[in-house]
Curated annotation (Swiss-Prot):
Prevents the cell division inhibition by proteins MinC and MinD at internal division sites while permitting inhibition at polar sites. This ensures cell division at the proper site by restricting the formation of a division septum at the midpoint of the long axis of the cell. This is Cell division topological specificity factor. One of its GO terms (biological process) is cell division. Keywords: Cell cycle, Cell division. It comes from the Bacteria. HAMAP family: MinE. It holds the Pfam family MinE. Belongs to the MinE family. The keyword Cell cycle applies. Coiled coil: none annotated.
Length: 84
């Protein structure tokens, strides 16, 4: 390895650069397409798991997705029955 390659780095082939870019584009599109599609399944899973431990009404669990700045936040609200 020459000292020039240490300074400027190894030159990548155009095919490998194109492949990396395509992988990034595909990953970004997958995230964009499935953004809110998973929420109903997540809600069903939460109902199933919580129902193992506490008797709840499935309508008492609300799942939402909201954007806060650069982040997407999953908000989960669960109304639990009063414990005696």
């Amino acid at each position: 390895m020459s000292w020039l390659s240490l300074i400027f780095g190894e030159k990548k082939s155009t095919a490998s650069v194109a492949k990396e870019r395509l992988q990034l584009i595909i990953a970004h599109e997958r995230v964009g397409l499935s953004g809110r599609d998973f929420l109903p399944d997540l809600q069903k899973d939460l109902v199933a798991v919580i129902s193992k431990y506490v008797k709840i009404d499935p309508d008492d669990i609300k799942v939402g997705l909201e954007k806060q700045g650069n982040y997407e936040v999953i908000e989960v609200n669960i109304v639990l029955p009063e414990m005696r």
